[in-house]
Amino acid sequence: MKNNKKLRTWLDDFNLSHPLVIAGPCSAETEKQVLTIAHELKDTDVSIFRAGIWKPRTRPGMFEGVGAIGLKWLKKVKEETGLMTTTEVANANHVKLAIENDVDVLWIGARSTVSPFIVQEIADALEGTDKIVLLKNPVNPDLSLWYGGIERLYSSNIKKLGVIHRGFSSYSKSKYRNNPEWQIPIAVSYTHLTLPTTRHV
């Protein structure tokens, strides 16, 4: 994949004098919660409202998100606040439902990035759309997986791309929940110099 300035034009189109800010609840739990937070954020520097609709959990029986009903809440956020919206997608059906509900930005989570099959399924489902797609780093510090995900999306003619640095899981004791391993996002930015990179907090 060649270094391509078109990959970041979507970010330039925001015409911001500050970094792009994406904020919102980790999980959408109720319509009231989502709308209350969105209204509190609308007059800040936040440009995109985020909320997890589907939550990938390690074990069954844990809260796995409210599901598709939450997309209706995101639609209300757009209507009432004017904020753009984003949520995580992990398969082709998620993509279909998000597009049907006019979600502006789709992100692929760290657990999905580790699977070329999942990334390819999502890339195929997004082909021909004009959505902004953000790809989190894989759970493990594997640069090739991150590159591969970017390349799969780009090969499906998805040109509004960005990456999210969330840090990496580690078996060793650390003061961080996720180790930054800064050399990896730096390597990605050097290889794809015009690809927007965001930091997950």
Task: Give short role names for the model-derived ranges.
Residues 50-68:
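Glycine-rich, proline-tolerant flexible connector loops at the mouths of alpha/beta enzymes
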Residues 132-193:
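Catalytic alpha/beta core domains of metabolic enzymes, predominantly
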Residues 1-22:
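N-terminal amphipathic alpha-helix/helix-capping segment at the start of soluble metabolic enzymes
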Residues 20-34, 86-88, 174-177:
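Active-site mouth loops of central-metabolism enzymes
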Residues 192-201:
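Single conserved hydrophobic/aromatic residue that forms the stacking wall/gate
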